[in-house]
Amino acid sequence: MVEGFYGAPWSQEARIRQLDFYGRNKMNVYIYGPKDDPYHRTPNWRKPYPAREGEELKVLVNRAKENNVIFYWAIHPGQDIRWNEEDRSLLLQKFESMYQLGVRGFAVFFDDISGEGTKADKQAELLNYIDDHFVKVKRDVAPLILCPTEYNKSWTDVEGGYLTTLGDKLNEGIKVMWTGDMVVATIDKSTLDFVNPLLKRKAYIWWNFPVSDYVQDHLLLGPVYGNGLDVKDDMSAFVSNPMEHAEASKISLYSVADYTWNMENYDSETSWKHAVRDLMPLHAEYLEIFAAHNSDPGQNGHRFRREESVAIQPALSALLKAYQEKNEIDEDAYRQVAE
């Protein structure tokens, strides 16, 4: 899981509950990278966390360990980074401060930026330096992760050589994230066949679902479907970016765990029903109805849609047809929808 959405970050209590949920469902990675944490990104990525915030992160790190979850802390320096020794040293100092809090997984995000920070050769040089002078030196740190600037196919300039440069220059053990053909998209074999040769490694999937920061007036509570069932050998990892609504996100995260642990036999509808019962066992029937009617983001700039109100679609279609063609109400269809 990657907490990488825009909007109100999760509370400390919500994160603790999430980590316990991951432990119960065998989700083994949590990447801390909320876009609205000022010490994660510009302007304060160079500064250590204040004592209170640092102690809260330490609590989360320890809770993650209790649940057999690798806690990754991500830094987002690209919007104002200077490619010089001073900033490189400040970045390592920040990582060292996080290491002292117990963090043993680190990521560097260069997504959603412009300007000097987007240069692939400079990014690769920095990541290799971190890998050589921090990750490998510590010897107890998980593989370094990079979220690149061109992180989906629609934004990739193949002729410009950005991804090829990363593939050629990055140390072999560094992981590179990818969201698919678009910012919000399902993951299939074709998108991995496209990106893996460029990166010269298996992509680390950042799946932008059920994140809803691009449709903040919607909840995405429906089944998790559409990802390939034949891609487990073509990716190095798979993490989901959730909604700012932590508890509601658990419906999808439950199914993401199902999908990643048993991809070939994954059944989206069965998993969704199990997720609903797991989240609200005493009122699963009511939550299932609510979730079934709150699953589609509606029209959006990413052109990502989901099925919604599937059980009553025939009745809705009949109602619409009767009204459009005869300016009347189909009573049977109306009764089905009302029930």
Task: Give the positions of each predicted feature.
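Catalytic-core regions of glycoside hydrolase
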Residues: 4-5, 113-269
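Short, well-ordered coil/turn segments that N-cap beta-strands
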Residues: 26-28, 65-71, 102-106, 140-142, ...
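Conserved beta-strand positions in the central sheet of alpha/beta enzyme cores
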Residues: 31, 107-109, 239
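Hydrophobic or amphipathic alpha-helical targeting/insertion segments
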Residues: 90-107, 111-115, 129-133
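Short beta-strands and strand-loop turn motifs
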Residues: 73-75, 107-111, 146
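C-terminal functional modules
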Residues: 261, 265-339
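Amphipathic alpha-helical segments in well-structured domains
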Residues: 57, 88-91, 120-127
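Feature activates predominantly on carbohydrate-active enzymes
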Residues: 1-87, 94, 100-104, 136
